[in-house]
A protein has these predicted regions:
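Vicinal oxygen chelate
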Residues: 17-26, 64-79, 84, 90-118, ...
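Short secondary-structure capping/junction motifs at helix and strand boundaries
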Residues: 111-117, 124-128, 155
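Fold-core signature of tandem repeat domains
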Residues: 18, 39-41, 76-79, 148, ...
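Core segments of cupin and vicinal oxygen chelate
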Residues: 24-75, 113, 120, 136-141, ...
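A cross-kingdom feature marking solvent-exposed beta-strand/loop segments within repeated
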Residues: 47-64, 84-102, 119-121, 126-144, ...
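A charged, solvent-exposed segment within the mature domains of Sec-exported extracytoplasmic proteins
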Residues: 140, 150-152, 160
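N-terminal beta-strand motif that seeds the catalytic metal site of vicinal oxygen chelate
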Residues: 2-30, 45, 101-106, 159-194, ...
Length: 323
């Protein structure tokens, strides 16, 4: 076995699951009202941290951080409010093809009913309305989807799978909001991203498609959108979906000075059996660290003992955690 294959195999064993998706927010109470009242997430834990260990983990000096862990179905998100220092807002002209774009795909049992529910709560549209992807596309035909925004402007998606697509548990008739299938990120080049997520982290490809046409344009609200989509999976948990815009190539890169307290910051939290092995795999691929190294966390706050944050080739944050 060559060195790259050995590294990939070792790290594939170290990454046990996609534990959660972290989202930075500006006002925790406002966000909780949205995620638990407009959407039916349930609060699992709520706490604050400060101190040197968390500064070195998050790459933000002088932080005081509140984290609320929420559950929908079997999946988890973590809302993060930096009480200090405050970060920057999402650019008002953000588009779905900018490379800081990330969303979670919430599966619903009835698209029309879910959309009506969101309309009653006056959610901000990111799509023109729900779209049904055309049947000529064998890997996506029949999927219904709609993009909207949370109070900070973060993109979210509701999605309904037809009977022949998606995990069997997404075909239930109730509840209306079933869980999170994946988080999607915009990437500049799929092959470059696969070297990170597949070859270094050990995720497997679960499906691929090329989507275009008026339905896709209106879903993303990007004229002329043509996407290469690659679905990836860890051994457990929701997936990671790579979105490469083959057209238009006008999406802007992740700001090089992005910090975890900036409101466009999301992070994919992978549970690892050994964060040292994860760190070695990231370092072997010459990918960037956010953390100063693997950080031992005092008092096992949030049930975490050790953690490391790095960045993928496009600057999306990835965290390896030991619980």
């Amino acid at each position: 076995m060559n060195t790259l294959a050995a590294s990939a195999a070792a790290h594939a064993q170290a990454v046990q699951s996609l534990d959660s998706i972290g989202i930075t927010v500006s006002d925790m109470q406002r966000s909780l009202d949205f995620y638990t009242k407009v959407l039916p997430f349930e609060s699992v834990s709520d706490g604050e941290v400060t101190g040197e260990a968390y500064e070195h983990l998050m790459g933000v000096f002088g932080l005081r951080l509140r984290v609320v862990r929420l559950r929908l179905g079997q999946e988890f998100i973590e809302l993060m409010q930096f009480l200090a220092p405050r970060g920057r807002p999402i650019p008002v002209d953000s588009r779905s093809n900018d490379r800081w774009f990330q969303h979670i795909a919430i599966i619903v049992s009835d698209m029309e009913q879910a959309y009506s529910h969101l309309r009653k709560h006056n959610v901000e549209h990111a799509s023109t309305g729900p779209q049904r992807l055309p049947d000529w596309n064998p890997n996506a035909g029949g999927v219904k989807a709609f993009y909207f925004r949370d109070p900070d402007g973060n993109h979210l998606e509701i999605c309904q799978f037809p009977p022949d697509k998606g995990d069997p548990r997404w075909h239930g008739k109730s509840p209306l909001f079933l869980g999170i299938d994946h988080t999607a990120i915009v990437v500049a080049d799929t092959e470059t991203s696969l070297k990170f997520y597949r070859d270094t982290l050990g995720l497997r490809i679960g499906g691929e498609s090329e989507n275009y046409g008026p339905e896709q344009e209106r879903l993303n609200n990007v004229f002329g959108a043509r996407l290469r989509i690659t679905a990836l999976r860890a051994p457990a948990g929701p997936g990671v979906e790579l979105l490469e815009y083959l057209a238009p190539r006008t999406g802007r890169p992740m700001p090089i000075d992005t910090k975890a307290n900036d409101l466009w910051h999301w992070q994919v939290n992978f549970r690892a059996a050994d964060t040292d092995a994860a760190a070695a795999a990231v370092r072997s691929g010459r990918y960037d660290y956010v953390s100063s190294g693997v950080i031992a966390l005092p008092d096992a706050a949030f049930g975490l003992h050790r953690a490391l944050m790095g960045r993928d080739p496009d600057g999306h944050a990835v965290t390896f955690i030991e619980r």
